[in-house]
Amino acid sequence: MMWSNFFMQEEDRRRTAVGRRRAQEQQNLGLTPEREGKIKLGLLVAIVGATLAVLAVGTEFWVELNTYKTNGSAVCEAAHLGLWKVCIKRLWQADVPAGRETCGPAELPGEANCTYFKFFTTGENAHIFQRTTKKEVNLAAAVIAVLGLTAMALGCLCVIMVLSKGAEFLLRLGAVCFGLSGLLLFVSLEVFRHSVRALLQGVNPETPPAPRLAYEYSWSLGCGVGAGLILLLGGVCFLLLTLPSWPWRSLCPKRGGPTA
């Protein structure tokens, strides 16, 4: 009877020690509330950038192409396009602001004809106001933008895994993904600018002559610029969180500490 009590006590001690060890390991693997709050704040910044990026890539108000108003005509034409489709609108000149020489802005009510670009399917160029797109440049801008969205999604997944599973080694990968997505968005914007210039120069030798055009970048492109900046900021924030804390403590000593 005495030996059985001894073995039972030893078994209880062993189980208690194992439970304490496992609890200590889980505590070491977990995130402190302060660090978890910083990561959540960085994720919130990244989500704002991701929302702007999806809004920019999914809409077709990257650039507006406006014809000049003509005397004796009650309507004029304007177009707005993005990465995937183009919309040509017929606007009433009476709705156009009086001090404006060109037709537009494209947000005015009017008859719209929207079509998706065919160079994603059949490889055909689009014709806008007797001008031809350069499909290679447009395709490059769209593909780079999609790669940026993919990197952004991977970054969000990495940060979510850090918060849910405590896998802090994924934080650096998430920082790289967010920074890469911001850079890819900026590259896509620059390539799209080149595609607009190529479109304006691609006049078809047809009759009647191609109308004069004026162009202006619209709010979708502004969302893309904002998304790129915010995603880069999010990547930098996550990268700073992966750095060791002791260099910053040495640069910012606590008040009231011992002095030499």
From Swiss-Prot:
InterPro entries membership? PMP22/EMP/MP20/Claudin, VDCC_g6su, VDCC_gsu
GO biological process per UniProt: regulation of calcium ion transmembrane transport via high voltage-gated calcium channel
Q: Where in the cell is it found?
A: Cell membrane
Identify the tissues in which this protein is expressed.
Detected in heart atrium and ventricle, aorta and skeletal muscle. Detected in heart left ventricle.
Q: List the disulfide bonds.
A: none
Transmembrane portions of the chain: 43-63, 143-163, 169-189, 221-241
Keywords from the named record: Calcium, Calcium channel, Calcium transport, Cell membrane, Ion channel, Ion transport, Membrane, Transmembrane, Transmembrane helix, Transport, Voltage-gated channel
Q: Which GO terms describe its cellular component?
A: L-type voltage-gated calcium channel complex
Q: Which GO terms describe its molecular function?
A: calcium channel activity; calcium channel regulator activity
Principal cellular location given in the protein's record: membrane
UniProt topology in membrane: Multi-pass membrane protein
Assembly information from the UniProt record? Interacts with CACNA1C. Identified in a complex with the L-type calcium channel subunits CACNA1C, CACNA2D1 and either CACNB1 or CACNB2.
State the similarity comment. Answer: Belongs to the PMP-22/EMP/MP20 family. CACNG subfamily.
Briefly state the protein's biological role. Answer: Regulates the activity of L-type calcium channels that contain CACNA1C as pore-forming subunit.
Tell me the protein's name.
Answer: Voltage-dependent calcium channel gamma-6 subunit
Q: Which organism is it from?
A: Rattus norvegicus
